[in-house]
Structure formats: structure tokens, C-alpha cells
């Protein structure tokens, strides 16, 4: 892989996503001891509680393929992924009832967070790593910083509506904005027509994603495609509680300038489809739910959904930012 964080931590992320998609707990049990061993590896490549190296003569990348020179520090990014993976393993423990591991893992995560704050947080500004290349989004995603941290991040992207981030920061910035009530800004970044944008690729004739914002090297590389899932998770609002798509929640986050959308995903339980049209202060929904699941529409209240097709017309909530 390319580094100990964004690449190596797939050892936990892949089985976790498999569990979420299919509800199969056995994959978590299979990988839990392997992830613990990987944590030993990360500890052996850490200094002052920051991951600083990989195997000798191997890459130790942090974020990758930023449009301009990479300045976000590699140990900051790798510790972010270490902490996020500890949190994933805590989810393993919850599902598998491995409460014996929780105190040690919780303490480990707190140590790693403290190292990030100690090394990279500026108490005068509220920024991490000077808020470069999405750094504040990494911190906010871990619950670090203060109110200024997120506010400074939002201000930066309101003033610079293009991605200055690499393959990880692009994903994290977009998700953090959607999750924290700034769907419109996330949508503006996704549809930006500035120099480093998905539109710019399209405008120059690309039919696949290049490896770099600047078109270097491969012209068919999937790694910037992580944000595509947010079209379904946030814009259409197709989410789930639990695992295996047995408890479906439709919770769209509307963005100014986007008045209609339609799409579907094929889950372990069957196809889930959503269409919405916003007009004259109301939202018309058409939602299809598969058999054998619980489901609800979480918009303007909570509306139970049984198997089949449902059509709603609801007053629009004034929450888009």
C-alpha cells in the first residue's frame, strides 16, 4: 500500500463495510485479532504517539494527489486514520460483545488524539495545521478542536469553492459538511466549475476520473470517486440503522440550487429508490421500499414506510445551508 493510514487501515474498514452491507458479524470476528496486530505495527512505527513511518524504504504517505504541493503533514493524516480505525474496532467490540477490549482501546484513541492536539492545534486560531488542505475537517471528524475549527473550515471553502485536497481530504471535507448542516456548501464543491473540480475534468472531455486533479498519470483512476456515495447517502438520503439494510431511513439533506434528484441502490434486502422534486415550498417524494424491512422517511417529521411505492407531498423545511 501507499502508507500506514489511508491504505493499511483498510484492514478494518473493508470488513466493517462488508458487515454494514450484509449484516454478517463473522467477518468482524475474523478480522478483530488481525486489526489488533496491525495496531502493534502502527505503534512500532510511531514517535510521540504519532505514526511517522512505514516499512524501511516504503512510502509513508498521508493525503495523496492534492492539486498543489502536499503540505498537510503525513503524521497528522496517518494518526487521523489510526484513531478512526480504533473507533471502527470499538464498533467491532460492540457488535461482538467484546467489552473486555473497550477500556484499552478507548484510552489508546485518547492518547492519539492528545498527540494531534499537542502537535498540530493552534489555540489562538482554532486551526489544525493552519487549516491547509482540509486539515480542520480531519480534526472535526474526530471531535477535536472547538467551534472555530469548523467555522474556519466553512469560511475557507465558502471563499475558495474548489477542492484543495487529496483523495482522503476530498472525501472527508464533503462528508463533514453534509453531516454538520452545510449541504449547500458541499453541493457547491461537488458541482464547482473552478480549476480543481469534477466539472473541470468533464469539461475537458474526461469520461473517467484521472488520478490527479491536474490530469497527471492515469486517466482512469477510481480513488477520487469516494464522494459518489454521498449522492445516495445525503442528497437522496438513503441510509440505514444497524446492518444488513433491515432498518432503512430516508433522510435527504437538501441543497440550495438542487430542486430534484432520483436514484436507487441495490441492497441485501432489495432495491431502495428515491425521487424528490422541490417546488413552491413543498417537496414531492416517490419512495420504493423492498419487502421484509422496517423503513421510515425522516423529513418534516417521521413517516413509516411499508414495502412498495409511497408518494408524499410535504412542506419544505428551511434547513439548507
Predicted regions and their residues:
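Carbohydrate-binding/catalytic loop surfaces
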Residues: 1-6, 10, 22, 51-77, ...
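Active-site acid/base region of carbohydrate-active enzymes
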Residues: 6-9, 13, 21-80, 93-138, ...
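Well-ordered alpha-helical scaffold segments within catalytic/enzyme domains
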Residues: 11-27, 81-99, 137-147, 171-180, ...
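Long, well-ordered core segments of solenoidal/helical folds
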Residues: 31-51, 107-125, 144-163, 181-201
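Generic beta-strand/beta-sheet core signal
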Residues: 45, 54, 131, 177, ...
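Alpha-solenoid helical repeat architecture
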Residues: 164-171
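Non-catalytic C-terminal accessory modules of carbohydrate-active enzymes
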Residues: 184-321
Amino acid at each position: 500500500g501507499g502508507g500506514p493510514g489511508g491504505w493499511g487501515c483498510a484492514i478494518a474498514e473493508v470488513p466493517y463495510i462488508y458487515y454494514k452491507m450484509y449484516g454478517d458479524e463473522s467477518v468482524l470476528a475474523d478480522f478483530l485479532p488481525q486489526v489488533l496486530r496491525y495496531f502493534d505495527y502502527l505503534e512500532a512505527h510511531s514517535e510521540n504517539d504519532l505514526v511517522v513511518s512505514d516499512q524501511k524504504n516504503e512510502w509513508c504517505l498521508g493525503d495523496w494527489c492534492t492539486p498543489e504541493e502536499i503540505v498537510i503533514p503525513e503524521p497528522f493524516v496517518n494518526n487521523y486514520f489510526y484513531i478512526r480505525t480504533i473507533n471502527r474496532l470499538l464498533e467491532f467490540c460492540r457488535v461482538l460483545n467484546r467489552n473486555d477490549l473497550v477500556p484499552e482501546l478507548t484510552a489508546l484513541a485518547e492518547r492519539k488524539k492528545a498527540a494531534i492536539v499537542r502537535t498540530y492545534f493552534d489555540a489562538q486560531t482554532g486551526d489544525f495545521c493552519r487549516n491547509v488542505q482540509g486539515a480542520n475537517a480531519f480534526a472535526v471528524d474526530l471531535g477535536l478542536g472547538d467551534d472555530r475549527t469548523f467555522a474556519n473550515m466553512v469560511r475557507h471553502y465558502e471563499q475558495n469553492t474548489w477542492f484543495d485536497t487529496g483523495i482522503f481530504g476530498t472525501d472527508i471535507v464533503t462528508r463533514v459538511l453534509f453531516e454538520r448542516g452545510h449541504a449547500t456548501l458541499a453541493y457547491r464543491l461537488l458541482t464547482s466549475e473552478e480549476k480543481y473540480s469534477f466539472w473541470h475534468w468533464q469539461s475537458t472531455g474526461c469520461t473517467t476520473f484521472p488520478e490527479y486533479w491536474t490530469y497527471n498519470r492515469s486517466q482512469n483512476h477510481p480513488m477520487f470517486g469516494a464522494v459518489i456515495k454521498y449522492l445516495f447517502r445525503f442528497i437522496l438520503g438513503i441510509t440505514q440503522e444497524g446492518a444488513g439494510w433491515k432498518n432503512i431511513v430516508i433522510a435527504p439533506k437538501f441543497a440550495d440550487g438542487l430542486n430534484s434528484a432520483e436514484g436507487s441502490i441495490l441492497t441485501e434486502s432489495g432495491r431502495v429508490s428515491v425521487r424528490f422534486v422541490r417546488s413552491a415550498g413543498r417537496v414531492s417524494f416517490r419512495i420504493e421500499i423492498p419487502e421484509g424491512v422496517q423503513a421510515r422517511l425522516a423529513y418534516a417529521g417521521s413517516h413509516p414506510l411499508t414495502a412498495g411505492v409511497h408518494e408524499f407531498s410535504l412542506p419544505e423545511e428551511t434547513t439548507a445551508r
